[in-house]
Amino acid sequence: MTKGILGRKVGMTQIFTKNGILVPVTVIEATPNVVLQVKTNESDGYEAVQVGYQDMREVLSNKPAKGHAAKAKTSPKRFIREIRDVELKDYEVGSEITVDSFSEGDVVDVTGTTRGHGTQGNIKRWGQSRGPETHGSRYHRIPGSMGSIINRVPKGKKLPGHMGGKKVTVQNLVIEKVVPEKNVLLIKGNVPGAKNSLIFVKSAAKAAK
């Protein structure tokens, strides 16, 4: 069954494994998430658990949000997500989900919002090569040919535009270490997002059985 938790990206560091191998890891701080709602087939048409992360000032929340959080005996949350394919009997409204639900060696999918780079050209956005700088070349950093078909640009053509700031999921990352006393997960490799950005960690959908 699927496990999941919301947290924030602290940054990257490196640790030694038990075999003495140096491994780069991303530090994810995931303070306890509160179960705000348990959705069932009878009431909602599907099964899921709704979790909230990071308290919001009540001044910034509206009455529906306050009432929804009050049912779980907690304050309104800034971030709310749903986790599907869960064992509903393991969750109660108002209970907490902590990093203890994961263990070392678990394979997870990590979702975050990539760092925004604004408007960029083909070379930075798509990693294309630049043209010659001399010998009469007029092709330095421009996109190049638009294709052999006239009067239109083919769909999917790689062109300059907005780079980053998109929701991205990196699959099949391994949890190297769990530090419950600090609410921290150490995940092997890098994950999308800037420091302090929201990160969603859940059980891998395509992990080897």
UniProtKB/Swiss-Prot annotation:
Keyword Repressor: no
Any one GO MF annotation of this record: rRNA binding
Organism: Lactobacillus johnsonii (strain CNCM I-12250 / La1 / NCC 533)
Keyword field contains RNA-binding: yes
Name the record gives this protein: Large ribosomal subunit protein uL3
Biased composition (Polar residues): 112-122
Family: Belongs to the universal ribosomal protein uL3 family.
Region (Disordered): 112-146
Function: One of the primary rRNA binding proteins, it binds directly near the 3'-end of the 23S rRNA, where it nucleates assembly of the 50S subunit.
Gene3D superfamilies (UniProt xref): 3.30.160.810, Translation factors
Subunit annotation: Part of the 50S ribosomal subunit. Forms a cluster with proteins L14 and L19.
InterPro entries membership: Ribosomal_uL3, Ribosomal_uL3_bac/org-type, Ribosomal_uL3_CS, Transl_B-barrel_sf
GO cellular-component term (any): cytosolic large ribosomal subunit
Biological processes, Gene Ontology terms: translation
Alphabetically ordered keywords of this record: Ribonucleoprotein, Ribosomal protein, RNA-binding, rRNA-binding
NCBIfam families per UniProt: L3_bact
